[in-house]
Amino acid sequence: MNIPSIENCDLHNKAVLLRVDFNVPIKDGEIRDVTRILRALPTIQYLVNASAKIIIISHFGRPKARDNNLSLKNVIDTLSQLLNKKVKFIDDCVGEKVQKAVSAMDAGDIILLENLRFYEGEKENDANFARQLASLADIYVNDAFSCSHRAHASISRITEFLPSYAGFCLQDELKYLEKAVSFKAKPITAIVGGAKISTKIKVLMKLTEKVDYLVLGGAIANNFLSFSKVNIGKSFFQNGVDDLLHNIVETANKNNCKIVVPEDVLVAVNSDYSTSISRKTESILDGDIILDIGSQTLSTISSIIASSKTLLWNGPIGVFEHSAFASGTIGVMKIVSDLTHKGKLTSIIGGGDSLSAISAAGLTDKDFTYVSTGGGAFLDWLSGDEMPGVAALQKRLD
């Protein structure tokens, strides 16, 4: 894909507005997964070495108003430690305080601004807010693939006001995902998990046209089991989507894509998540809640993956946050990692929950061919949808 790269511009002593994705999971004040911060480091370090003045912007969570729990101040210490360099935090995004801080910067300095989503103009893709952000810098760099499916002020609108380029993380994401969706190395298996099937209808339709096996997990699998007249007890599923499921099944049959759903499951009874009970799918009871795949399904999925050349994975297979229901997700993760290390499988994994699952399995992104930082962005890319952030950069070449 042809997009402008930061390697093709003069950065010396220039103020660079760098859009990253520091929307990292935090619990009890601790960052649980630093993957997204790590992915931004090569671009930040490149800008430092090029003697630029780096102004970092990001969103964090989904605040409805200013909220200290969702302040980017929470990541400043970790960022400084990883860079081995002092990063100054400014508790605003625009305005006089920020302008003064930028004016005082020397080449190689780094400042981190406050959460973009504390401002309504960000999600509204507001031109005035984008213009205010742009006034801080000489150059804009997008290094947030995971946000580039959003038409937000700091992602797409801002490119109207500044020379705009892609950072290394964004470039890497596009390179690997373009390779993945070329669908050349067959057989291809896709694993799709998660809660709401309605958010993944488009990508499921696309995948049934391209892959050999579509493995379903999570509540999405519950929907398909229910559609097949299997009793799913009290398990979570989405109502009113049977017509969509029918279309997916028809498309899969037409394209010789085998849809794989659990043949056995691990369930909780009476919402007791501390203990799992194994059931064949035909033996699920009315009070059961399906929270993971069973051992036979894990074996089936393992065999399918072992026969594949390419794997695409979005969303966990089970509720891995509870140890009693983590064996499916972690088991498949370890099989995929092993085959990847042996050079037998190209593995592309995407989605915020997937990053957490990798950590839960005691693995890192180095154990797979590529781990995308994107969730919705990953799905949109697989679906073939235009991504506003990427399209905005491409327009700069016109």
Swiss-Prot record:
One of its GO terms (cellular component) is cytosol. Its EC number is 2.7.2.3. InterPro entries: Phosphoglycerate_kinase, Phosphoglycerate_kinase_N, Phosphoglycerate_kinase_sf. One of its GO terms (biological process) is glycolytic process. The keyword tRNA processing does not apply. Keywords: ATP-binding, Cytoplasm, Glycolysis, Kinase, Nucleotide-binding, Transferase. The keyword Transit peptide does not apply. It catalyses: (2R)-3-phosphoglycerate + ATP = (2R)-3-phospho-glyceroyl phosphate + ADP. It holds the Pfam family PGK. Its main location: cytoplasm. Substrate binds at residues 21-23, 36, 59-62, 117, 150. Gene3D superfamilies: Phosphoglycerate kinase, N-terminal domain. GO terms for molecular function: ADP binding; ATP binding; phosphoglycerate kinase activity. Signal peptide: none annotated. Disulfide bonds: none annotated. ATP binds at residues 200, 321, 351-354. It is found in: Cytoplasm. Pathway: Carbohydrate degradation; glycolysis; pyruvate from D-glyceraldehyde 3-phosphate: step 2/5. PANTHER family: PHOSPHOGLYCERATE KINASE, PHOSPHOGLYCERATE KINASE 1, CHLOROPLASTIC-RELATED. Monomer. Belongs to the phosphoglycerate kinase family. This is Phosphoglycerate kinase. It comes from Wolbachia sp. subsp. Drosophila simulans (strain wRi). The gene is pgk.
